[in-house]
Regions:
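Active-site loop-to-helix "anion-binding N-cap" substructures in soluble metabolic enzymes
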Residues: 1-176
Length: 176
């Protein structure tokens, strides 16, 4: 309640797709909405590593939208081969399956976060992502969204960087 008239927005790190039922430890989208949450992260790499599938992520997106939340959909590859193109196919598959049954009006309410798992600070043998990597993937994500929803709709979707950033590179990511 104290945040209601502030410029601060509240977000949650996870959501459950069922509205109610015997799901101990899970928090529904409606419960998050009722306590004033605005945003919810869906499809984070750590959740995927625990077995969360694209189909479950799709259910979470739909549930979050129905409850009036703004979902932040994380997509990204676990490794990036220099020439194999596999990383592109991974992101295309994630978007295609996670956004199944999402309408043009609904996609405009979703934030897409590019989260390169290989660049996260918690990943063993990680290496740095560059603003160029993000720029390339942002263009690719926008193309996939254009294929799925049309250019005008795709251009209205917010795409952000969700990997490791620091004081030295944050400005470069913000300029993309």
């Amino acid at each position: 309640k104290q945040l209601k008239n502030k410029k601060i927005k509240l977000g949650a790190q996870n959501v459950f797709f069922e509205k109610n039922g015997a799901y101990t430890g899970e928090v529904s989208a409606q419960m998050l909405h009722d306590i004033g949450v605005d945003y919810v992260i869906v499809g984070h790499s750590e959740r995927r590593a625990m077995g969360e599938t694209n189909e479950i992520i799709n259910k979470k997106l739909i549930s979050s939208l129905k409850a009036g939340l703004i979902p932040i959909l994380c997509v990204g590859e676990s490794n990036r081969g220099a020439h194999d193109g596999f990383y592109l196919a991974t992101v295309r598959e994630q978007l295609s399956l996670c956004l199944a049954n999402i309408s043009k009006s609904q996609i405009k309410q979703i934030v897409v976060a590019y989260e390169p798992v290989w660049a996260l600070s918690s990943t063993p043998d990680r290496h740095d992502s560059t603003p160029h990597d993000f720029e390339e993937m942002k263009i690719y994500i926008r193309k996939i969204l254009t294929d799925m929803f049309g250019q005008a709709t795709a251009l209205s979707v917010c795409i952000i960087y969700g990997g490791s950033a620091n004081k030295d590179n944050a400005g470069s990511y913000l300029s993309i």
